[in-house]
Amino acid sequence: MFDPKYLESGEFYQRRYRNFPTLIIVPIFLLVVFIVLFSLFAKREIVVKASGEIIPAKVLSDIQSTSNNAIDSNQLAENKMVKKGDTLVTFTSGNEKISSQLLTQQINNLNNRIQSLDTYKHSIIDGRSEFGGTDQFGYDNLFNGYMAQVDTLTSEFNQQNSDKQTADQQANHQIDVLKQGQSKNNQQLANYQAILTSINSNTKPTNNPYQSIYDNYAAQLKSAQTTDDKEQVKQTALSSVQQQIDQLQTTSSSYDSQIAGITKSGPLSQSSTLDKIADLKQQQLASAQKEINDQQQSLDELKAKQSSANEDYQDTVIKAPESGILHLTSDKATIKYFPKGTTVTQIYPMLNKRTKLSVEYYVPTSNSVGLKRGQNIRFVANQNVTKPLILTGTIKTISSAPIIIKEESFYKCIASINVNVREHEQIKYGLAGKVTTTKGTKTWFNYYKDILLGNTN
């Protein structure tokens, strides 16, 4: 029978509850419970590690090759300080220089020709030569030929005018002679009419050269015996005088007809000659203007070719467009040719305490899940010192498409970094280091679960 007094014995409890299984299982159980609870609630950072280098936040200039010619002089060097206008690369430029010089010579020749044409045009407008001497293109001779044609037209008009004046003078002389004859005839007619009047009125005329006719009539009339005889004498005398009057009147009419038959041309108009001169002037001006337009078109074409040739010639020299520090995208120092359009170098801004910096790095596409802008990064410089440079920053840009590098694909990331004045003194462009990007956090339970399931992101 079990003795109850043993229940109060410490030895009983010690032997019953402080055995080996009890001391091992309980702590292990508690440890497992703690680990499970820790893995469910405790979190760890999910990071992506990559290699990166420090670059400026803003590149001043990307310089590309401007010629396919062989390199004549190469002044490129990594981290070399350059000033604006410094020569970086020169290419061989034999053909480009000759072409530019020939085009310049042709353009100068065309400019001189157009200037001579303009002088020729203004000479025509002003009607006098504005050439200071012999024109090298012969436009002074062309103007002299034009003026000779104008002088010919003017001389023709002057000759016509002179001939007209001579003809008019001859006509006026003929008219004067006829009028003089008509005047004498009219005077005779007046005298005969006066005799006729005297016979009719039996009044003796005075100062009349034909008074003898009246005197003869008066004598016959006096010798007549009868009235009929007197009447007969009178009628005979009147008839004789009337015949003379009729003859003189006919002669006077003949003079009028002759005078009327002598015609003179009207005033000789110069408008026809002036019109011919004006037409000639317009033809010459139109011809000169057309030639000016043609030459100007040729000049524009040559200038376009010259501009292209000058660009080709200028393209044989690459100069720094900004002051800064050179960064070579690859080793360009020993290359003999830069294909046109390829990037030769970049110009970074001068490093000072105000220079904003970034870190450029590449993340494999296999680790890109969850990567986004605004995530924090930490940059640890590859420096052989006890305390390397550590910088923090934030992702600003992620390339929209992966980049193939050595048959592997990466996403390009650029993160802005925070740098104080002391840290600036330790930094140079191209300083390499390790970049750790914090993509987020997850519990330890989910972390190991993802490892077991093969999800490494």
Swiss-Prot record:
Top-level lineage group: Bacteria
Subcellular location: Membrane
Keywords, ordered alphabetically: Bacteriocin transport, Membrane, Plasmid, Protein transport, Transmembrane, Transmembrane helix, Transport
Keyword Secreted on entry: no
TM region positions: 22-42
Keyword Membrane among record annotations: yes
GO cellular component: membrane
Bilayer topology annotation: Single-pass membrane protein
InterPro entries, sorted: MesE/LcnD (IPR005696), MFP (IPR050739), Secretion_HlyD_CS (IPR006144)
Gene Ontology biological process terms from the UniProt entry: bacteriocin transport; protein secretion
Protein family per UniProt: Belongs to the membrane fusion protein (MFP) (TC 8.A.1) family.
NCBIfam families associated with the record: bacteriocin_acc
Protein role: Involved in the secretion of mesentericin Y105.
Protein name (Swiss-Prot/TrEMBL): Mesentericin Y105 secretion protein MesE
Gene for this chain: mesE
